[in-house]
């Protein structure tokens, strides 16, 4: 599934947290487990509409996106992971807006949000931008051996979710983007 080295930079606090990461590959969902092996990932309901995918998603501990279910898991002491954009971004620049669900989940559960940035070793470049997000993702799905070699996972400092949901969502996105490693050309 992965080609190249996987490197995790940073550590998590003890106890339940909401991991909030950028989403530039379908492999991100598995990489949250490199941060905390017991993390439960919130995934799009479409995953559960296909019998084959549903079987594996349940086996891997994925949970259909639901604020109530996520809050319940966190209150049980589990770690939950979410990609607040809800969509895969082909270029890895975290340009899509974050949805407010992550902040609302953390507020209701009373747990910190931990920003996470997945940085893959190779991105396709701007040539894919004329295409829709769906087409970009299909291109990357077909060409993943060329465009997703190795990954660095950067874990940020925990954030208190208290405050205005929209403001905290913007701050969460800024914290995730700030974790992007500097890459020399």
Q: Can you say where each PLM-predicted feature lies in the sequence?
A:
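Anion (oxyanion) recognition and catalysis
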Residues: 58, 74, 107
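Catalytic core of membrane glycerolipid acyltransferases/transacylases, capturing the structured
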Residues: 11-69, 92-94, 124
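Catalytic-site beta-strand/loop segments enriched in glycine and acidic/polar residues
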Residues: 73-103
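N-terminal membrane-anchoring alpha-helices
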Residues: 1-7, 137, 182
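A cross-family acyltransferase "interaction/gating" segment
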Residues: 93-164
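Residue-level preference for the first positions of well-ordered beta-strands
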Residues: 16-18, 79-83, 114
